[in-house]
C-alpha cells in the first residue's frame, strides 16, 4: 500500500509538472515586441501564461548555444542570423507550416524569410516585424542625400553612426558596391570591408560619437549636437513627432531592410503554445497592438486600417507611393563574415 501511495504521488507530481509546462510559453524577444496587453489577451483566450525574456540577436544565439536550444519555446532572431547559427550549433528546430495560418502573413515577407531561413528543405523562420535603417537629418540645419554626406567638411563633429555591421553595409552600398552579392566570395568581401573601413577612419572626425543605444542618439539629435545620422526609421519618426524639421529619409543608395522572425528553439518543450501564439499575434487586431507598442511594421495581413494615421503619414513621407524597391533586405550571413567585419570595426574604433 505504501509503495502504491508513493507511486501515485510521483505520478501526480509528474502530471502536474507536465500541465504547468503546457500552460506556459517561454519567449525570448526584443524590447516592446511582446506588449503586456497582448500577453493578457492571449492568457484570457488560451489560459497559457507567457514568460518573457528580453534580448537581442547576439544574446539569443549565445543563450541557445549554451543550452543546446533549451530554456525557451519561441525566439525572435533577425532572419539573417538564423541559418549560420543553425548550421553551426543546431539551436533551432524546423517549423511545421501545417500548424500555422499562413494566410495571415503578407506573401512578400513570407517569401523573403522562407528563402533566407530554409536549410535542407526545412523552414526555420517566419516573418514578424520589419523596418529599415536610413538617414535622419535636421532639415532646418543641413541637407543630406546619402551616407557619404555624413563625412562632408561642414558637418565635422556633428554626425553619428553605430559602429556595427549595418554601417559597413550602408557605406558599401553608397560606394556603388553590393556587399550581399559578395557573401560567397570571402576574398572580395574582405577587400570591400577594408575599403569601407578606410572610408570610416577618414570620416572619424565627423562623428560626434559612435552611439551604443537609442537614447544616446535620440538625445544627441534633440539637443542639436548631432544634425544628421544613420538611424532606424522608427527613431526618426519619433523625433519627427516632436520636431517636424527632423526627418527620416531613404538614402540615394537605398535603405537597409531587416526582418525579425518567429523561430522554434531546438529543445523547446511547448511547441503547441508557440504555434498558438504565432497564429494569435498575426491576427490583424493583435498585430496592430504590436505596431503600436514598437512603432515598426508587421508582416501580418490587413493591418493598414488599424495603424495610427500619423505613423502612416510618416511612412508615406519617407517611402513615397509605398515604394519598397529601394530596400536592400539582409540575406542570411554565411559563417566567418562577422569575424571579418569585427576586425574592420575594431580598426575603425582604434584609429585616431
Predicted regions and their residues:
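Extracytoplasmic ligand-binding site segments that recognize negatively charged/polar headgroups
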Residues: 76-218
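Early extracytoplasmic/lumenal segment of secretory-pathway proteins
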Residues: 23-85
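Conserved C-terminal helix/tail region of periplasmic/extracytoplasmic solute-binding proteins
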Residues: 321-352
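A bilobed periplasmic-binding-protein/Venus flytrap-type ligand-binding module shared by bacterial periplasmic
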Residues: 134-141, 174, 259-270, 289-290
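A ligand-binding cleft/hinge motif common to bilobed small-molecule-binding domains
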Residues: 81-84, 228-245
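Periplasmic-binding protein-like
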Residues: 193-203, 242-266
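Mature extracytoplasmic/periplasmic domains
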Residues: 256, 265-325
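Bacterial N-terminal signal peptides
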Residues: 7-16
Amino acid at each position: 500500500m505504501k509503495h502504491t501511495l508513493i507511486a501515485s504521488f510521483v505520478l501526480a507530481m509528474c502530471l502536474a509538472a507536465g500541465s504547468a509546462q503546457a500552460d506556459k510559453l517561454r519567449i525570448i524577444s526584443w524590447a516592446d515586441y511582446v506588449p503586456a496587453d497582448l500577453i493578457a489577451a492571449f492568457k484570457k483566450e488560451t489560459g497559457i501564461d507567457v514568460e518573457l525574456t528580453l534580448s537581442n540577436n547576439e544574446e539569443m544565439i549565445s543563450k541557445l548555444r549554451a543550452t543546446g536550444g533549451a530554456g525557451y519555446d519561441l525566439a525572435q532572431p533577425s532572419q539573417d542570423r538564423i541559418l549560420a547559427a543553425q548550421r553551426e550549433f543546431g539551436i533551432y528546430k524546423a517549423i511545421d507550416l501545417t500548424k500555422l495560418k499562413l494566410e495571415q502573413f503578407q506573401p512578400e515577407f513570407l517569401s523573403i524569410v522562407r528563402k533566407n531561413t530554409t536549410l535542407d528543405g526545412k523552414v526555420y523562420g517566419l516573418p514578424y516585424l520589419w523596418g529599415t535603417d536610413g538617414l535622419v537629418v535636421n532639415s532646418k540645419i543641413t541637407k543630406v542625400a546619402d551616407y557619404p554626406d555624413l563625412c562632408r567638411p561642414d558637418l565635422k563633429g556633428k554626425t553619428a553612426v553605430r559602429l556595427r555591421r549595418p554601417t559597413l553595409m550602408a557605406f558599401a552600398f553608397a560606394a556603388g558596391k553590393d556587399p550581399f552579392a559578395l557573401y560567397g566570395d570571402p576574398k572580395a568581401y574582405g577587400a570591400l570591408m577594408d575599403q569601407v573601413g578606410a572610408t570610416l577612419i577618414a570620416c572619424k572626425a565627423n562623428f560626434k560619437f559612435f552611439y551604443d543605444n537609442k537614447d544616446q542618439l535620440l538625445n544627441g539629435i534633440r539637443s542639436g549636437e548631432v544634425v544628421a545620422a544613420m538611424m532606424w526609421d522608427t527613431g526618426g519618426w519619433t523625433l519627427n513627432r516632436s520636431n517636424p524639421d527632423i526627418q527620416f529619409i531613404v538614402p540615394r543608395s537605398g535603405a537597409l531592410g531587416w526582418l525579425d522572425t518567429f523561430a522554434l528553439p531546438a529543445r523547446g518543450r511547448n511547441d503547441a503554445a508557440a504555434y498558438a501564439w504565432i497564429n494569435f499575434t498575426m491576427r490583424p487586431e493583435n498585430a496592430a497592438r504590436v505596431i503600436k507598442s514598437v512603432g515598426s511594421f508587421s508582416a501580418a495581413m490587413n493591418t493598414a486600417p488599424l495603424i495610427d494615421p500619423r505613423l502612416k503619414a510618416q511612412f508615406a513621407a519617407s517611402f513615397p507611393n509605398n515604394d519598397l524597391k529601394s530596400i536592400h533586405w539582409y540575406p542570411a550571413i554565411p559563417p566567418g563574415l562577422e569575424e571579418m567585419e569585427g576586425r574592420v570595426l575594431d580598426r575603425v574604433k582604434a584609429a585616431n
